Structure formats: structure tokens, C-alpha cells
């Protein structure tokens, strides 16, 4: 038989082994705690930063915007050593916060740029009318800006969730206890010095990909709209 031929019979045994040997449910719990918190945090901070950059004039505004753009040139690998030392000093290793904080910081620049481009396309007249009706800045942001920014917020949510969910580098460094490993970190446990169970690995990869596919399918309509907002000015 060829290595590429279909199996003689199909079985769910590898999936059963994945749940029994790898403690997948616990790993899912930590993954969703980390990725969900990162996604919500990035959406909140990025929308607030974009609102300030697009609606207010202040000294050093251009420098702040340039700093946000420039920060995209520095990958997480370049800053992981000082971040790791900081987490050690704060006694946060093997804590979800040790992964959440660096991931929020790593996603914030891109998310702010996406949100800024979208907010620049929102007419100021809508906000001015709300101010004339007696609304304060917090109500304008919550009632007008946030609902209109749903496409860009969906884009930010998708990219933040996927990046956090698949980020093996930060998770592996900050999470030292195997019982607290997120789902993507479990793949390393399948490969060992004694060999690799490819059936178990294939089943585990399928289990890991399922949440990613669900998130993408639910929010895919807003990706292009959110990324291209503000690209054309009329």
C-alpha cells in the first residue's frame, strides 16, 4: 500500500486519545481565557486610542501616531527577554496574565491603525449633532462611534484572537506548568525523543483548528470591510 492511500477503515481512536492523554478540555479553557481576554482588551484600548487620535488635537499627536506605526517593526521576539524578566519580578510566571499582557501590547499597534482608518471615515456631523443634544464624550463614543465601528472591531477581534490563540512562542516561555498549557502548546507533548504519533498529532491539529475556523466563518464578512475602511477618500 502507498503511504498516500486512504486507510482501510476510519476510526475515532486518535480523537479519543487526544482527549484522554493530552487533557484537551483544560487546555481549551486556558486558551479561551487568554485569547478572549486579549481580544476584549485590544478592542477596548485600540478603539479608545483611535478615538483620541482622530477626534482631538494635542501637542505631540504626530509623534504618537508615528510611534505606533514604528512599533510594528519590532516583533515580539525582540522584546521577550525584558518582558520575561519583568514577569519574573512580578511573580507572574505560569499565570495567564503573563501571556495576556504581552499579547495585548503586541496587537495594540495594528489594531489602533485599523480603528484609526475606519474612524476617519465617520462624518463628524453625527457627533456634533449629539453634542448639541447634550450628550457627553463618553455617550458619543458608546452610542455612535462603537456601533459604527463594528466592521473594524470585528476585524480587530479576528486578528487578535487568531494571533493569541496560535502564539506558541509567548505561551511556551511564560507558561511553565504543563497542567496550565494552552491548546497550541500541547502539540510539543506529542513529539518526543521516542518518536511521534502522527495519528494523534493529526487529530490534535484538527481539534486545535476547529475554534479558529468557527471564529473566521462567523466574522469573515467584516474582515475586508474593516481593513479597507478609510483607504478611499471621497
Language model features by range: what are they?
Residues 1-234:
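A structural signal for multi-pass alpha-helical bundles of membrane permease subunits
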Amino acid at each position: 500500500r502507498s503511504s498516500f492511500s486512504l486507510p482501510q477503515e476510519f476510526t475515532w481512536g486518535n480523537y479519543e486519545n487526544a482527549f484522554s492523554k493530552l487533557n484537551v478540555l483544560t487546555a481549551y479553557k486556558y486558551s479561551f481565557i487568554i485569547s478572549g481576554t486579549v481580544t476584549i482588551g485590544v478592542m477596548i484600548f485600540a478603539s479608545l486610542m483611535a478615538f483620541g487620535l482622530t477626534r482631538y488635537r494635542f501637542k505631540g499627536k504626530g509623534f504618537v501616531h508615528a510611534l505606533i506605526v514604528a512599533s510594528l517593526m519590532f516583533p515580539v521576539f525582540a522584546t521577550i527577554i525584558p518582558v520575561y524578566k519583568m514577569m519574573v519580578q512580578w511573580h507572574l510566571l505560569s499565570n495567564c496574565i503573563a501571556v495576556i499582557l504581552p499579547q495585548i501590547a503586541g496587537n495594540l499597534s495594528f489594531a489602533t491603525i485599523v480603528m484609526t482608518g475606519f474612524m476617519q471615515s465617520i462624518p463628524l456631523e453625527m457627533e456634533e449633532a449629539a453634542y448639541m443634544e447634550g450628550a457627553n464624550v463618553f455617550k458619543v463614543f458608546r452610542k455612535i462611534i462603537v456601533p459604527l465601528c463594528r466592521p473594524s472591531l470585528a476585524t480587530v477581534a479576528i486578528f487578535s484572537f487568531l494571533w493569541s490563540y496560535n502564539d506558541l512562542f509567548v505561551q511556551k516561555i511564560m507558561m511553565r506548568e504543563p497542567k496550565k498549557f494552552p491548546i497550541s502548546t500541547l502539540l510539543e507533548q506529542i513529539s518526543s525523543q521516542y518518536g511521534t504519533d502522527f495519528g494523534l498529532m493529526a487529530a490534535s491539529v484538527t481539534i486545535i483548528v476547529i475554534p479558529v475556523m468557527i471564529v473566521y466563518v462567523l466574522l469573515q464578512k467584516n474582515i475586508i470591510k474593516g481593513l479597507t475602511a478609510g483607504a478611499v477618500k471621497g
